[in-house]
Amino acid sequence: MKQYKIKVLWLRNNIAIAVDRLIGDSLFPMTYYYFWPRTDAWEQLKIELDSQPGLFAKDKVVILNQVTRIIDYWQENKKSVFPNLSELQSHFPDLICSGCY
């Protein structure tokens, strides 16, 4: 997952998830932010990742599995408006937390 970063916006009633590609020291958006559970963010990310040229199937599986784990973690901890960022980072080292509201 070193080539990809998952970005989240942690909200009380939703979690927004997007995927960026890491090239050198720069991040380039691969997907829009999708809000779970407002929409089926996992399915929307899958559709966008399917349309990405040059994205290997194994990388897509790793990304989507990580998204599943992040959504599960959010569901278990959504009562926490401000998650413990060091704990979040220890569970998901490739995650970028864009904000907590």
Curated annotation (Swiss-Prot):
The keyword Transport does not apply. Its main location: plastid. It is found in: Plastid, Chloroplast. GO terms for biological process: translation. One of its GO terms (molecular function) is structural constituent of ribosome. GO terms for cellular component: chloroplast; ribonucleoprotein complex; ribosome. Gene3D superfamilies: 3.30.390.140. It comes from the Eukaryota. Coiled coil: none annotated. Pfam families: PSRP-3_Ycf65 (PF04839). Keywords: Chloroplast, Plastid, Ribonucleoprotein, Ribosomal protein. PANTHER family: 30S RIBOSOMAL PROTEIN 3, CHLOROPLASTIC (PTHR35108), OS04G0461100 PROTEIN (PTHR35108:SF1). Part of the 30S ribosomal subunit. Belongs to the chloroplast-specific ribosomal protein cS23 family. HAMAP family: Ribosomal_plastid_cS23. Probably a ribosomal protein or a ribosome-associated protein. This is Small ribosomal subunit protein cS23. The gene is ycf65.
